[in-house]
A protein has these predicted regions:
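Anionic-ligand binding patches
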Residues: 2-5, 11-192
């Protein structure tokens, strides 16, 4: 059975990835489940650079482990870009306001910063770059987006991160109000993994 290691410690992201990749028939492991204890510094200037850095660094470690020598390592870098805020928080989405700051606080801060801004200027997108480091040492990266606007309040229990403020006008709800199945169907990650 093919093994795919997804370079993340984010449990919510692993749930989403396992659902998206469930039809592959591969064993999907998180970095932790594979026993890889590495904290890769994502110091790239773009989502694509950060995804490639993470995938290649984790692949170097995995290739030293006999059970993962032929594993594919996937890594993503993703975040929220808000046009009115000059694409903030961007590549710093996870570290915005500090890594220990809860998303409830991050989301409320973004809503406060956009107070009084009309919907047509609240355009935003989730961006995801996924890199695949192959056993032969090659690495490919693709980028996808999911367009929306920043809503006016926190809404929804599904999803994680910025989902409760990311409003999808065509569905009349936030990403966090979508069912997990619908969210995965629309996901910026899903669109990339099937490329």
């Amino acid at each position: 059975m093919e093994k795919i290691i997804f370079a993340t410690g984010n449990e919510h992201k692993m749930i989403e990835i396992r659902a998206i990749l469930s039809d592959l028939g591969a064993e999907i492991l998180s970095q932790k489940e594979a026993g890889i204890k590495a904290d890769v510094v994502e110091d790239g200037a773009t989502f694509e650079e950060n995804a490639m850095i993470k995938a290649t660094e984790i692949a170097k470690i995995a290739n030293q482990m006999p059970e993962y020598k032929n594993a594919v390592v996937l890594a993503d870098d993703s975040g929220l870009e808000i046009d009115y805020l000059n694409k903030e928080p961007g590549i710093y989405s996870a570290r915005y306001m500090g890594e220990d700051t809860s998303y409830d606080i991050k989301n409320q801060t973004l809503l406060d910063r956009l107070e009084g801004v009309p919907d047509e200027k609240r355009t935003a997108r989730f961006v995801c770059a996924i890199a695949a480091a192959m056993p032969d040492g090659s690495c490919e990266v693709v980028r996808g987006t999911m367009e929306g606007i920043i809503g006016h309040e926190i809404a929804g229990e599904n999803g994680f991160g910025y989902d409760p403020i990311f409003f999808l006008p065509e569905y009349g709800c936030t990403s966090a109000e979508l069912s997990p199945e619908k969210k995965n169907e629309l996901s910026h990650r899903l669109s990339l993994i099937h490329i």
